[in-house]
Amino acid sequence: VSYEAFLHFKGTRFLDVIAAGVASVGLMAVSYHFSDGTILGESAATATYVFLGSYIVVLLIYFYAEECIREDVVKKIGKIKKATREELKKIMLSFGCAAMLLELFFNYNVTGFDTTSRTAYVKSMDDYHAVLAEAENQAQDKGILFYRTEELERKTKNDAALYGYRSATQFSSLMNLDVSHFYQAVGMEGGKNFYCVNGATPLLSAMMSLRYVIADNAMEANPIRTLVAESGNTYLYENKYVLPLGFMMDEDVIDAWDYSDLDEIEAQNRLAELLGADEPMLTEIPSESVVGESTIDVQEDAYIFATYESTTVDSMTEEISDGRTKSFTKVSHGYTLDLGYCTAGTQVKIKNSNEERVNITAYALNLDAADTAYQTLNEQTMEMTSFSDTKITGTIDVKKEGRL
């Protein structure tokens, strides 16, 4: 449609711009009204209206001047010479190009992703292949056909395609949007054309068959994962809680787990409760936020997560008193921060790149609650016998009815 309009650009009339402007604003208003907020946020909608209005004004002035030249008459804007009208057209074209560049810049900041150099992107290729080969060997020894792998700090949303492992992260315009919505509802990262496992708790990662985690340091072993392989500065950890691709869930649990009106922490605590946990799986612990950073003084050994208020800050850095650091990118997407396992007396600082105050809420993982919920799901599981891109076969011994 845009190309057809461009082909007939010289024949466009003043009234054509008015009609197109009204139609565009109307379409935008209808789209925003029926949007659920995860596709088109308020800030993005406001910016779209501003840019759309700018284009309409620029085109109206441009074609008004054009009609004045064609008709060679003086209209309401006063006596303007033909040469002046030509200058006015050039100015409007310049304004239009400037508005387009600003829109591209804004759109990238809202929906784009950080880039990395080719050198950095493939720097650890051999090490990745080495630990992934070890993961495959270990899985085969255990008779496991299917499992997923993720990185604690990925370079892009498509790292799985580069290194050749199966993940629960995808960047694609053809993805299932409902998966993205689910990820967002339970504190993971999601958007219009991607979903990412960032922010997953042990229960969620277990449900996604996430068996292995790749990290760039040897300090990530803890009660929920163990170090099983390493190559260079690349380390492979195996998660304690992993479910196979197929597992049974009680229909009563599915019906009762309505997370639509719950925040991401409440949604997970509710699921754990329905699966038999006697205590909340995630419990709030003290934290303090000031301009530029937030601090958590860990009182007891625990795996720590954190949520935060909506923010325009794009990146945060975690600094732990034991020497570990971790970077979080695109935090404006609003996912839960996985701060890792910390012992009593450890201090965790979360600094942001904009030197702004970002109020966080920290949570400690209750391992007993997580274990209870996991064991409930692990009671009836499917033993996979083969799989391909289009077919999965397996067997399961169902002792209690439910949904696979």
Residue ranges: model-predicted function:
Residues 1-127:
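Contiguous transmembrane helix-bundle modules in multi-pass membrane proteins
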Residues 91-403:
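Soluble catalytic regions of membrane-associated enzymes that act on cell-envelope
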